[in-house]
A protein has these predicted regions:
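Short, solvent-exposed loop/linker segments at the N-terminal edge
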Residues: 25-28
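Extracytoplasmic electrostatic interaction patches
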Residues: 84-148
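C-terminal motif of bacterial Sec signal peptides marking the signal peptidase cleavage site
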Residues: 14-17
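Positively charged n-region of N-terminal signal peptides that target proteins for export
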Residues: 1-4
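Tryptophan-paired
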Residues: 48-100
Length: 148
């Protein structure tokens, strides 16, 4: 009988010690926003055909007028604007993407930074592109913006 009680105590201690601790933390960085801007009539990238120069691109936060960091990738006639700053925290962003001080389109994103099951990640609740026609290629994660 004494052994049974000790055995039960040992089992109950063992079971109460089991927690859902995270031995491995995981993190998935937010997906960047990538934009290829093309001529609506020809479908040709406006930086590849030299209609515009990338040095005249501005990304402006419409909330406070501040400039937003971005990258411009220009390799082998692949000219893409990339914004990597969205989704690192829970936020709503409203950006104006401009070339030569002309607004090409606006980007609205409702982003949520979450931690579930020991993993941190971003969820985009809403994404809106306004003032331009566009297509989204889910496989490439690329928005093609059509301008006149």
């Amino acid at each position: 009988m004494k052994k049974s009680i000790i055995y039960l105590l040992f089992i109950s201690l063992f079971l109460t010690n089991c927690k859902n601790d995270c031995n491995k933390l995981c993190f998935t960085p937010p997906e960047p926003f990538q934009f290829e801007i093309v001529d609506a009539k020809t479908g040709i990238n406006v930086f590849t055909n030299n209609t515009y120069e990338s040095r005249y691109i501005k990304v402006v936060n419409l909330k406070d007028g501040s400039r937003v960091d971005y990258n411009f990738i220009s390799e082998n006639n692949y000219n893409v604007l990339t914004i990597n700053t969205i989704g690192w925290e829970t936020e709503i962003v409203n950006y104006s993407i401009q070339i030569d001080d002309n607004e090409i389109f606006t980007l609205y994103v409702d982003a949520e930074f979450l931690s579930e099951n020991c993993c941190s990640f971003s969820r985009y609740n809403e994404i809106k592109i306004e003032n331009a026609q566009y297509n989204y290629d889910k496989e490439k994660g690329l928005y093609t913006i059509f301008i006149n």
